[in-house]
């Protein structure tokens, strides 16, 4: 122990030659103790950094949840009775090969049953000398698809230094559009790709705080696929729906 070596060193304070070996031992003991202190400090810092990262991640997730709920409260559509929101993000629906100012901007929503894009932006209606003097707010549903019609989704990093997050969807037959390219803002595209995959496989049904109503599941499964009025194919029926409207003749079919 350092205390013992220190006592020996004090006892040999008048004997330089005899004190030298003790001094060497003491230096080694101090160096060893310093190494242990540094290791303990690194371990504590690591624990703190890990905890801080978890706190930051939790705060970020909480912020996303609050923002999603706020957007849903303002949305032009409503969730179905047994539908759960998973994620929402600011997005631009890229209509061509490259993104332009004419592409609709708004919010991309992912639920356990649907993929929804709502345009939500201020559009210039009047300019004076290239300066916008009047705007109008546009908010309307542009895309609404059952998650089962999502065949695939590709995530990609683009732009300078790969700081832009993009999602490219491929939709199945019966969808209103075959493809959908979205530039999302502020969230990771790879994370979104994983969330969409989980929604498609039904993983989120296992994590619900309130179990899925099996009666609603059976009602959706037993729903007609053809319109009883014109014989046209009806849109997919989602859990929680009470009626479905034929896109051909306009008849509302009660489930």
Predicted features and spans:
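Short linker/helix segments within small regulatory modules
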Residues: 236-245
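Long, hydrophobic alpha/beta structural blocks
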Residues: 5-10, 14-17
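Short cysteine-rich clusters marking metal-coordination/redox-active sites
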Residues: 227-230, 246-249
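Cys/His-rich microdomains that often coordinate metals
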Residues: 234, 252-255
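Acidic, Ser/Thr- and proline-rich intrinsically disordered linker/docking segments
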Residues: 103-107, 116-226
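Structured ligand/cofactor/substrate-binding pocket environments in proteins
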Residues: 112
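Membrane-proximal, solvent-exposed terminal domains/tails of membrane-associated proteins
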Residues: 223, 233-237
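Anionic N-terminal interaction surfaces
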Residues: 1-4, 23, 27-109
């Amino acid at each position: 122990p350092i205390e013992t070596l220190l006592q020996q060193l004090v006892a040999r304070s008048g004997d330089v030659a005899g004190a030298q070996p003790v001094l060497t031992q003491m230096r080694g003991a101090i160096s060893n103790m310093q190494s242990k202190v540094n290791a303990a400090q690194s371990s504590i810092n690591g624990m703190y950094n890990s905890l801080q990262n978890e706190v930051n991640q939790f705060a970020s997730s909480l912020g996303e949840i609050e923002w999603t709920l706020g957007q849903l409260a303002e949305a032009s559509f409503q969730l179905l009775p047994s539908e759960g929101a998973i994620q929402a993000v600011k997005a631009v629906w890229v209509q061509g090969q490259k993104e332009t100012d004419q592409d609709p901007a708004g919010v991309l929503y992912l639920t356990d049953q649907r993929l929804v894009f709502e345009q939500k932006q201020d559009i210039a209606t009047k300019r004076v000398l290239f300066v916008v003097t009047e705007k109008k707010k546009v908010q309307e549903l542009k895309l609404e698809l059952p998650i089962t019609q999502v065949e695939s989704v590709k995530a990609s990093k683009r732009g300078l230094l790969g700081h832009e997050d993009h999602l490219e969807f491929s939709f199945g037959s019966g969808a209103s559009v075959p493809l959908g390219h979205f530039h999302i803002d502020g969230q990771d595209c790879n994370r979104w790709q994983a969330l969409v995959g989980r929604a498609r496989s039904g993983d989120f049904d296992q994590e619900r705080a309130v179990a899925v109503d099996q009666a609603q599941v059976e009602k959706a499964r037993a729903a007609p696929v053809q319109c009883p009025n014109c014989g046209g194919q009806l849109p997919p029926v989602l859990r929680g729906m009470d009626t479905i409207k034929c896109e051909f003749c306009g008849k509302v079919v009660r489930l």
